[in-house]
Amino acid sequence: MEQTYVMVKPDGVERGLIGEIVTRIEKKGLKIVAGKLMQIDRELAEKHYAEHIGKSFFEDLIGFITSGPVFAMVLEGDDAIATARRMMGKTNPLEADPGTIRADYAVHTNRNVIHGSDSPESAKREIQLFFAPQEILSYQKAIDTWI
């Protein structure tokens, strides 16, 4: 089973969207194998967004992601990365397909409610950044025996 990292950003947490987003994830068939509400500090934010160091928007990005709590998750399922990304929609909510999380809830590219890994490599890196191995659980959902 493939794993991916997904995070409800501060704007999503502050607007009370964690439950709605988790419901969508579970209804889609992805399994949450780790999850926690946390405050990201600058050091972790810089590691997470290392590829953007030196870009004009970097400081705003760090300021936003450290401005409030996030809900970090590890999801598991067949094709979990692509499935989660389709559910999220395009980065710019104005370009996101109707019915996606960003189209339905995001108001601006810089405040787009949710983050998700874009490749197996980034998923592995992000999961290791945000979760210790013992925080990631292995379990079988009741429905799995029927699939």
UniProtKB/Swiss-Prot annotation:
GO CC annotation, single: cytoplasm
Record SMART domains: NDK (SM00562)
Organism: Listeria monocytogenes serotype 4b (strain CLIP80459)
Domain of life assignment: Bacteria
Catalytic activity: a 2'-deoxyribonucleoside 5'-diphosphate + ATP = a 2'-deoxyribonucleoside 5'-triphosphate + ADP; a ribonucleoside 5'-diphosphate + ATP = a ribonucleoside 5'-triphosphate + ADP
Phylogenetic lineage: Bacteria, Bacillati, Bacillota, Bacilli, Bacillales
Subcellular location: Cytoplasm
Gene3D superfamilies in UniProt: Nucleoside diphosphate kinase-like domain (3.30.70.141)
MF (Gene Ontology): ATP binding; metal ion binding; nucleoside diphosphate kinase activity
Keyword Protease in annotation: no
GO BP of this protein: CTP biosynthetic process; GTP biosynthetic process; UTP biosynthetic process
InterPro entries in the record: NDK-like_dom, NDK-like_dom_sf, Nucleoside_diP_kinase, Nucleoside_diP_kinase_AS
Cysteine-cysteine disulfides: none
Record protein name field: Nucleoside diphosphate kinase
